[in-house]
Structures are given as structure tokens and as C-alpha cells.
């Protein structure tokens, strides 16, 4: 099997981002975004997704973290799409439920070629530490748009905002791991009756 890796660089007047991903990794992460809680969440995606991930980002965080988080989502989405290529032989779909103490989240993914995000999370706090919890949705919207994937992401219950967000990122990682896995029964075919995704 060919290596399923990709690197994307994105530079704007607001950020400079470099993302490298290996879909067949061991869950290792090297993260330097200047947004500590976000780095903690990206590490969950890598570890529980079984992907190796390197992210370097410098942004205008003196304003707020929005541009950095969104642009990392854009670059990561583009890197994922490049890494999985035409999706021949992939499982395509993935789903996971992940608990963290009192919190429970669900992620359901389709590497459909059609971008879409359905996001439901009623978080009890506007911030976890300094991190604005509105940016969770912004990150996943950017990622799904640029990966051309459909994602249904739901925080089903919880009281602690940190737990709720963290188990959502873990669930996304677990679902991604399943979706990008090789389907031995597919015979290398694209997982669609259309023959293309």
C-alpha cells in the first residue's frame, strides 16, 4: 500500500500553519499552535485516531484564538483529503461513542466528498481555561469543509465542559480511524456504487 501521508502549508495575513498527517501512524503528535487546550484536543484526535500528526501554527492570538483554530482546521482537512486520495479500498464510514466520566459524545463520519457538519453541543461554559468553546464548532466546520466529509458530532450529556469537549474530540478520532481503515473485502474499489467519491 502506498504511504498515506500529506503536508499542507497555509499562510495568510492572520496565520501561518503547517500540518503533516500520516493515516497509518501510531497516534504520535507534535503540536505547537500557541493554544494549549486546542493542542490537548488535537493530541486526542491523533492518539485515538491512530494517526501521526504534526501541527505548527503561528497566529494573531493577541486578538483571540479564532483565526489559528479555524486555519488549523482548514489545513488539517486539506491534509486528510490528500492523504486518503481517491478513497479506493477505504471503509468510508466511521462512528464512535466515547465517554469521559459523566460526559458522553458521539461522532459519525462519511468520507463522502460532500462537506457537511451537523453539530450539537450544549456546553455549560463559554470557556475552558482561556479557550473559547465556540471554537470547537468552528474547527470542525473548517475541517469537514476542506476534507469534503460529512460529520454528525453530538455531545449527548455531561456537566463538565472540559470533559464534554475532550470526549467529542476522542470520538472524532475513533470514528476517523474506522473510516480511513482498509476494507479488505472491497477489493480496492471506491466505496460507492457511483465508482467515485
Curated annotation (Swiss-Prot):
Coiled coil ranges: none
Protein name: Imidazoleglycerol-phosphate dehydratase
Native organism taxonomy: Bacteria, Pseudomonadati, Pseudomonadota, Gammaproteobacteria, Chromatiales
GO cellular component, one term: cytoplasm
Stated family: Belongs to the imidazoleglycerol-phosphate dehydratase family.
Gene: hisB
Cellular compartment(s): Cytoplasm
Pathway stated in the Swiss-Prot or TrEMBL entry: Amino-acid biosynthesis; L-histidine biosynthesis; L-histidine from 5-phospho-alpha-D-ribose 1-diphosphate: step 6/9
Keywords from the named record: Amino-acid biosynthesis, Cytoplasm, Histidine biosynthesis, Lyase
Top-level taxonomic group: Bacteria
Amino acid at each position: 500500500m502506498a504511504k498515506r501521508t500529506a503536508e499542507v502549508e497555509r499562510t495568510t495575513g492572520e496565520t501561518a500553519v503547517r500540518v503533516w498527517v500520516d493515516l497509518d501512524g501510531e497516534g504520535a503528535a507534535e503540536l505547537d499552535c500557541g493554544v494549549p487546550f486546542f493542542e490537548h484536543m488535537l493530541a486526542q484526535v491523533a492518539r485515538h485516531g491512530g494517526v501521526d500528526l504534526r501541527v505548527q501554527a503561528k497566529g494573531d492570538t493577541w486578538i483571540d484564538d479564532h483565526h489559528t483554530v479555524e486555519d488549523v482546521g482548514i489545513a488539517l482537512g486539506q491534509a486528510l483529503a490528500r492523504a486518503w486520495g481517491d478513497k479506493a479500498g477505504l471503509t468510508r464510514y466511521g462512528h464512535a461513542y466515547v465517554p469521559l466520566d459523566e460526559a458522553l459524545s458521539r461522532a459519525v463520519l462519511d468520507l463522502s466528498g460532500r462537506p457537511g457538519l451537523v453539530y450539537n453541543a450544549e456546553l455549560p461554559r463559554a470557556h475552558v481555561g482561556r479557550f473559547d468553546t465556540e471554537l470547537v464548532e468552528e474547527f470542525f466546520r473548517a475541517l469537514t469543509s476542506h476534507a469534503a466529509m460529512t460529520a454528525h458530532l453530538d455531545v449527548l450529556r455531561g456537566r463538565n465542559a472540559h470533559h464534554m469537549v475532550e470526549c467529542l474530540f476522542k470520538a472524532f478520532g475513533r470514528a476517523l480511524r474506522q473510516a480511513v481503515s482498509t476494507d479488505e473485502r472491497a477489493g480496492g474499489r471506491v466505496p460507492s456504487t457511483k465508482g467515485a467519491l
